[in-house]
Regions:
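C-terminal segment of N-terminal export signals and the immediately downstream linker at the start
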Residues: 1-25
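Short amphipathic, basic-aromatic surface patches that mediate peripheral association
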Residues: 32-34
């Protein structure tokens, strides 16, 4: 049963091309490309697709539809109201102005509360997707569980405690 579900998740398609392009545009504005890599190298858009498909069940409260797709709808509505165009057709400057209004929980505009909650989900997934990828880990310069060079306790500290290393340790 689980293998059938995995196959469905891998082979199925949740978002259409416009939606995937919109997610890509959002992600590249939230976390712009740098010399270490970008959203595409990290597979962030693919992560959205996998999560949307895998969590689109009643057990997950139809997360893909009610949260991820709903976010795209809400962001498009705001852009349509402000600029007369869907998000994908807006300039980066226009989109950033929308994100500035919905990026923080301290905005008390009642009309933006849903967008604020949905943007928090998007931002979290973008950051998680990037920084858990090979590109993001390199960007962090994460070294993992690698030992440092350690030459022991400094001599002045050893003298303070009147101790020393045995010769065979040195």
């Amino acid at each position: 049963e689980e293998l059938k579900w995995d196959y469905k998740v891998l082979k199925g398609k949740f978002f259409n091309e416009d939606e995937l392009n919109t997610i890509n545009k959002i992600a590249n504005i939230v976390l712009p490309p740098n010399e270490n890599g970008n959203i595409n190298d990290a597979g962030v858009v693919e992560l959205f697709e996998i999560i949307a498909k895998d969590f689109s069940t009643p057990a997950h409260n139809e997360y893909g539809e009610k949260v991820l797709r709903r976010g795209l709808i809400v962001f498009d509505q705001i852009c349509q109201e402000r600029f007369g165009s869907k998000l994908l057709e807006c300039s980066d400057t226009q989109i950033k102005s929308v994100f500035d209004d919905i990026a923080f929980n301290d905005n008390t505009d009642e009309n933006l509360q849903e967008a604020i909650r949905l943007f928090a989900v998007y931002r979290g997934m973008i950051i998680t997707g990037y920084f858990t990828s090979e590109v993001g880990i390199k960007d962090l310069e994460y070294k993992g569980n690698t030992p440092n060079v350690w030459d022991g306790v400094p001599d002045d500290i050893l003298k303070d405690y009147s101790v020393s290393y045995d010769e065979e340790w040195i």
